[in-house]
Amino acid sequence: VALVDAFLGEWPGAQEDRTDPAAPHEAGLLHLDVTKAAQVLGWKPVWTFAQTVRTTAAWYRDRHAGMAPGELCDRDLAAYVTAARAAGLAWTR
């Protein structure tokens, strides 16, 4: 719910809930954990939750407006790498 609310905050306007309460759920609980990546690979987040949602919403909004997916991916990847370099992450050296 927090993710959906954050996304809608980045893309205001009319929305329509098309979920089917009778449809099977993907899983009872989805739990993502980056602990192993952090311990083994030294992974650290580059963007905050808010920045990630903002960038994702912009990608979909711009795609909806007709921009090419490859162009959008290149733009966002460049922004991500720039932020990672600014944070001094080892994989950017």
Where do the protein language model's features map onto the residues?
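C-terminal substrate-binding subdomain of Rossmann-fold SDR/epimerase-dehydratase oxidoreductases
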Residues: 1-93
